[in-house]
């Protein structure tokens, strides 16, 4: 399945523990979507259009009124990407 680069970046961030939080207007309509990483940074690639596309494909879902997280379908459709994080492993 073809997904755009911003969608890929957003899914990778979600797979690493990020969440998507929504901003609504007075009428309850979604006006903005923000992807917050596990470290608290905001991902610039995540826009309202990216959010709607990922939700339409059911790659993300909200549970119990909480922030949106990656689903099993979203994780399956991720392409392999080198992780930039450096981990210290003893041994």
From Swiss-Prot:
It comes from the Bacteria. InterPro entries: YjhX_toxin. It holds the Pfam family YjhX_toxin. Belongs to the UPF0386 family. This is UPF0386 protein Caul_4643. It comes from Caulobacter sp. (strain K31).
